[in-house]
């Protein structure tokens, strides 16, 4: 399974960056984007709920959910990310609340229907070849009324557009261009487009927000600036 996953360039890229992923998540920009995403949950009581972190990386956000009382299963296609997640979970969070598994893709989730009260999918869908198939799987494993907390690249972000231009220009002169992740990050959308896509898969958008840039929150959370759209949605009955 791990060998098959490593055949895909986006997985090899995430394997390569796994050793520095946790450090990156502790940066001011990443802490701000995580806070903006979790703000959509507000003070919701998650104690005792079962959540899936679909594309968990090194488990940073899985541990935040576990700290709120969730039993969290984190899955990722990158073997190195999962190895790091397993090695870093002893941080005060009860170990029994965290399970990490390497799987080939979130387009085929190895869980029964209606298994989870919530699904977290943070900056993952842009790297998968079939977003619709992944959303169908997320819908399948969510219980009716269950929540999806998801972030995807903001198509309307002027800052993201400038990143893409810089990536394209630097790719012509360097084997390690600026914003390397953009070589693998393909999917982006507007809030309206995501609302329609979610609706097609039995999910109702409840709230949205913007984040992801290194700029102060007053700018970062503007629709034309934030490089990510954060979305809270609910599975219909």
Model-derived features: positions:
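Conserved class I S-adenosyl-L-methionine
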Residues: 1-46, 48-57, 60, 64, 92, 149-172, ...
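Short conserved loop adjoining the S-adenosyl-L-methionine
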Residues: 108-113
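A short glycine-rich, Lys/Arg-flanked "PGG" loop and its adjoining helix->strand segment in the class I
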Residues: 132-144
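A conserved beta-strand element that flanks and buttresses the S-adenosyl-L-methionine
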Residues: 120
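Acceptor-substrate binding/catalytic loop of class I
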Residues: 177-193
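Class I SAM-dependent methyltransferase SAM/SAH-binding core
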Residues: 58-107
């Amino acid at each position: 399974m791990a060998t098959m996953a490593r055949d895909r360039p986006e997985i090899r890229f995430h394997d390569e960056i796994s050793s520095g992923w946790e450090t990156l998540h502790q940066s001011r920009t990443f802490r701000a984007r995580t806070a903006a995403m979790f703000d959509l949950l507000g003070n919701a009581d998650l104690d005792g709920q079962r959540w899936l972190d679909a594309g968990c990386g090194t488990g940073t956000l899985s541990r935040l959910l576990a700290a709120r009382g969730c039993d969290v299963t984190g899955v990722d296609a990158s073997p190195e990310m999962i190895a790091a997640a397993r090695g870093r979970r002893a941080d005060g969070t009860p170990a029994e609340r965290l399970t990490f598994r390497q799987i080939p893709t979130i387009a085929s989730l190895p869980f029964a229907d209606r298994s989870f009260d919530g699904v977290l999918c943070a900056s993952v869908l842009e790297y998968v070849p079939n977003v619709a198939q992944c959303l169908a799987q997320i819908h399948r494993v969510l219980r009716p009324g269950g929540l999806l907390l998801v972030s995807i690249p903001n198509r309307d972000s002027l800052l993201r557009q400038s990143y893409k231009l810089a990536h394209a220009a630097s790719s012509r002169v360097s084997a390690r261009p600026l914003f390397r992740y953009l070589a693998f990050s393909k999917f982006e959308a507007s809030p309206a487009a995501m609302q329609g896509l979610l609706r097609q898969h039995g999910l109702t958008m409840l709230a949205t927000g913007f984040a992801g840039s290194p700029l102060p929150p007053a700018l970062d959370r503007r629709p034309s600036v934030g490089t990510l759209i954060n979305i809270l949605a609910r599975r219909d009955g």
